């Protein structure tokens, strides 16, 4: 496992350095979207609605829109200036009886590992929580969010491991507004007794290993059967198509280079390789938006090209 956060638990005058790890993982099968016609992969691009350009992730900022339609941009630098974001401390706010915490508030779970040469302070806090049957309510910052969390101890094969469960804030829990439940319903004693007997007949100790995700297991069997039944296929990555309508020189150059790489190593016309190389040089040297050059001008540039691919193309022609 790889830790996602480092900090220290602070309670009283004691600090417990810890590493934080995600405690759970998704076991669902992941599917790709493909075109039903030819099984080609479906790709999504982040396109700016103002200029129409495809935007790289590194060039994307966050913006907040107010109720009246006003927008303000919040950068990573802005967020880094917040005091809560800079904190690397898990602050213990209070200790509560374990039964008082409603499971509805639980969000995500994380393991805590000692992050020091000595684990004494870690073990001390873990044993204290276990023997007093208490949960620590803590406050810390994780992934650009201020978190309320529950710190508790869980026994893993005779190893006491401290865990943090992030909690939902009270205003994140919705009110179940079901008017039908406001009506009084009469339950007969015999009905209540019979229902209790059914519950007792089905009561047992909880053994999580007895339960399996039947749907995912059947889905894996289906996938394996198709793989073994000759239905598997592979789709080669297709080079980006040239967009004649774009005026973004850098984007055009990238597409031209992709086309040149796609042609190398196979049987291709050397003239096409040479033309692609000369077009790339023209795109780099011209600061204006790329335009189609007259045939004579393109031929003149090709004859003066000194790059290795151009020489190789000329040798093939001779």
UniProtKB/Swiss-Prot annotation:
Q: What is this protein called?
A: Non-homologous end joining protein Ku
- Quaternary structure? Homodimer. Interacts with Sir2 and probably also with LigD; may form a trimeric complex during NHEJ.
This protein's species is Mycolicibacterium smegmatis (strain ATCC 700084 / mc(2)155) (Mycobacterium smegmatis)
Gene encoding this polypeptide?
A: ku
Q: Which SMART domains match?
A: Ku78
Q: Which PANTHER family does this entry report, sorted A to Z?
A: NON-HOMOLOGOUS END JOINING PROTEIN KU (PTHR41251:SF1)
Question: InterPro entries recorded for this chain?
Answer: Ku70/Ku80_beta-barrel_dom, Prok_Ku, SPOC-like_C_dom_sf
One GO molecular-function annotation for this sequence? double-stranded DNA binding
One example of a Gene Ontology biological process annotation: double-strand break repair via nonhomologous end joining
Knocked-out gene: effects: Not essential for growth in the absence of DNA damage. 500-fold less efficient for NHEJ on blunt-ended or 5'overhang DSBs, 4-fold less efficient in repair of 3'-overhang DSBs. The fidelity of DNA repair depends on the form of the DSB; for blunt-ends fidelity is very low, and no longer entails nucleotide insertion, for 5'-overhangs remains 50% faithful but with very little nucleotide insertion, for 3'-overhangs repair is fully faithful. 1000-fold decrease in viability when exposed to ionizing radiation in late and stationary phase; not exacerbated by a double ligD-ku deletion.
Ranges for the region named Disordered are: 259-318
Q: Which NCBIfam families match?
A: Ku_bact (TIGR02772)
Q: Which Gene3D superfamilies does the entry link to? A: 2.40.290.10
Q: What family does the database annotate?
A: Belongs to the prokaryotic Ku family.
């Amino acid at each position: 496992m790889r830790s996602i956060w480092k900090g220290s638990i602070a309670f009283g005058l004691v600090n417990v350095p810890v590493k934080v790890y995600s405690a759970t993982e998704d076991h669902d099968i992941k599917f790709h979207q493909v075109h039903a016609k030819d099984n080609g992969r479906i790709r999504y691009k982040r396109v700016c609605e103002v200029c129409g350009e495809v935007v790289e992730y590194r060039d994307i900022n966050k913006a907040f829109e107010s109720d009246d339609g006003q927008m303000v941009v919040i950068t990573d630098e802005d967020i880094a200036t917040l005091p809560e974001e800079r904190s690397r401390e898990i602050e213990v706010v209070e200790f509560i009886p374990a039964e008082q915490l409603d499971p509805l508030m639980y969000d995500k779970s994380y393991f805590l590992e000692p992050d020091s040469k000595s684990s004494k302070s870690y073990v001390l806090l873990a044993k204290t929580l276990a023997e007093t049957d208490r949960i620590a309510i803590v406050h810390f910052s994780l992934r650009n969010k201020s978190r309320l969390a529950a710190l508790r101890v869980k026994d893993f094969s005779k190893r006491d491991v401290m865990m943090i469960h992030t909690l939902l804030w009270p205003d994140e829990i919705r009110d179940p507004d079901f008017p039908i439940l406001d009506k009084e319903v009469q339950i007969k004693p015999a009905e209540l007794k019979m229902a209790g007997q059914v519950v007792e007949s089905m009561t047992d100790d909880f053994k999580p290993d007895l339960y399996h995700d039947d749907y995912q297991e059947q889905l894996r069997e289906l996938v394996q059967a198709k793989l073994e039944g000759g239905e598997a296929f592979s789709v080669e990555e297709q080079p980006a198509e040239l967009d004649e309508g774009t005026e973004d020189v850098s984007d055009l150059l990238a597409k031209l280079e992709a086309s040149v790489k796609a042609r190398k190593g196979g049987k291709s016309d050397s003239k096409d390789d040479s033309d692609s190389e000369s077009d790339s040089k023209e795109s780099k040297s011209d600061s204006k938006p790329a335009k189609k050059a007259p045939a004579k001008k393109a031929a003149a540039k090709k004859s003066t090209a000194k790059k290795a691919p151009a020489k190789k193309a000329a040798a093939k022609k001779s």
